[in-house]
Amino acid sequence: MASVAATTTLAPALAPRRARPGTGLVPPRRASAVAARSTVTSPTWRQRSQRLFPPEPEHYRGPKLKVAIIGAGLAGMSTAVELLDQGHEVDLYESRPFIGGKVGSFVDRQGNHIEMGLHVFFGCYSNLFRLMKKVGADNNLLVKEHTHTFVNKGGTIGELDFRFPVGAPLHGIQAFLRTNQLKVYDKARNAVALALSPVVRALVDPDGALQQVRDLDDISFSDWFMSKGGTRESITRMWDPVRYALGFIDCDNISARCMLTIFTLFATKTEASLLRMLKGSPDVYLSGPIKKYITDRGGRFHLRWGCREVLYEKSPDGETYVKGLLLTKATSREIIKADAYVAACDVPGIKRLLPSEWREWEMFDNIYKLDGVPVVTVQLRYNGWVTELQDLEKSRQLQRAVGLDNLLYTADADFSCFSDLALSSPADYYIEGQGSLIQAVLTPGDPYMPLPNEEIISKVQKQVVELFPSSRGLEVTWSSVVKIGQSLYREAPGNDPFRPDQKTPVKNFFLSGSYTKQDYIDSMEGATLSGRRTSAYICGAGEELLALRKKLLIDDGEKALGNVQVLQAS
């Protein structure tokens, strides 16, 4: 799930005063600087483009390129927006009937909006906020109370309350010291561990701290945290729910780099921990505006077209280049050609797409060492208000929505994070005369993948009642289950070096996706950032790609002439 540091005009620094829940993470915006030349990939540009928030690119002055993008998820669309802004021609090919990828949604026959997961926008999603502002979607986010809320069995509430008159890092320090989610001893040990982390260095040397964080990729967060004095209880009651919400795996199995990246951002950016959620469904309020921006500028979407084969050749001098893509839609087949090809896939998708021969390159072979994490998203519609804990009578009326309006964490259920979308994203999810729409993310999803939907729904219902005893007696009037076999890539210790760069050994073939190399974690922000990096590489190779286009035209012409001569001779 998702989701940056920000130059945002999206919302005020503090949310409106209404105590409610949250969860969070993300990176601070970098100081703006002028990007390097557009047609030359200089070391300066490469260095800058690896930042969490790259500077704005200069206006591209190279040749206009035709670019084909495989995948219309957030990474593919981010790439398309950047390329169209630089004057290129862009086509996006998506095998599904809807766009958005892991942040997509669709409407079923009964008019219900079905999401691929629960999407939360951390205050450090600078690149995503930049994209949303560019496409006119920045007003589609609702700011939540600046607290992260933990719902424990029996309906007791624990909080990390970041509301404080003074910003980072003091607002975070007081939140951790005052939290009622941990006992005094665990809070003290938690404070010691964080004091011994790169978080402290980040206050005076953010770049140095991030490098120190990168160097901790080989160790799990649990091992690192406990080696610094943290307790197992802190992990179980606080950090595991947060970690499951972010990457769908627990602290024992996640790289310390991932968690410490988030901590570093929280320590240096007041808004990093401030959560936002969409007004309604992603298809309407996120993907929709991006799609309109793309099509208004001449970009084209081709839905239900899947790429079956990457057609490539190797020149006598050993250089490999793509000559086209074989696409299919039902019984139709088509070969499309472009100057540059972008694979904006998830981990299982890129593994299926890459020609097996390309594994001779270490960069491509390393991709096969990555795998995705299974996740199950459940939606439950009730005939009352599940998260209303104060007033039983209010929880039974259906005239107005009541309850906790935020992202919620729990350590006491198989779903680590959840939200009542009828409250938190009401535009599409509040229905007059109906109650809560609980959307819960089951992590780890492995035990639930083989189960029938009815059994999954039954298990989740029981756990909801354990968290909210006051909801006993409410009925589920509608439900849905979405299973994704491989979602975010598994950010296990030692996996970061296997993430590929967006530029590949194949001259006109590029990668985009949140799993690719960038300084943020696999998330909506990571996907958006990868698209910016991909576009920068393509623009930097503009003259080279033009030369390749001319070479291929000559080669095709010579082959066609040769075929004619053969026919004439026969």
From Swiss-Prot:
One Gene Ontology cellular component: chloroplast
E.C. numbers: 1.3.5.6
UniProt enzyme class: oxidoreductase
Cofactor(s) needed for function: NAD(+); NADP(+); FAD
GO biological process: carotenoid biosynthetic process
Disordered: annotated segments: 1-33
InterPro entries documented for this protein: Amino_oxidase, FAD/NAD-bd_sf, Zeta_caro_desat, Zeta_carotene_desat/Oxidored
Keyword terms, alphabetized: Carotenoid biosynthesis, Chloroplast, Chromoplast, FAD, Flavoprotein, NAD, Oxidoreductase, Plastid, Transit peptide
Pathway participation: Carotenoid biosynthesis; lycopene biosynthesis
GO terms, molecular function: 9,9'-di-cis-zeta-carotene desaturase activity; flavin adenine dinucleotide binding; oxidoreductase activity
Low complexity bias: start-end ranges: 1-16
Reaction(s) catalysed (UniProt annotation): 9,9'-di-cis-zeta-carotene + 2 a quinone = 7,7',9,9'-tetra-cis-lycopene + 2 a quinol
Compartments reported by the entry: Plastid, Chloroplast; Plastid, Chromoplast
Pfam family for this entry, one: Amino_oxidase
Purpose: Catalyzes the conversion of zeta-carotene to lycopene via the intermediary of neurosporene.
Family that this chain belongs to: Belongs to the zeta carotene desaturase family.
Protein name: Zeta-carotene desaturase, chloroplastic/chromoplastic
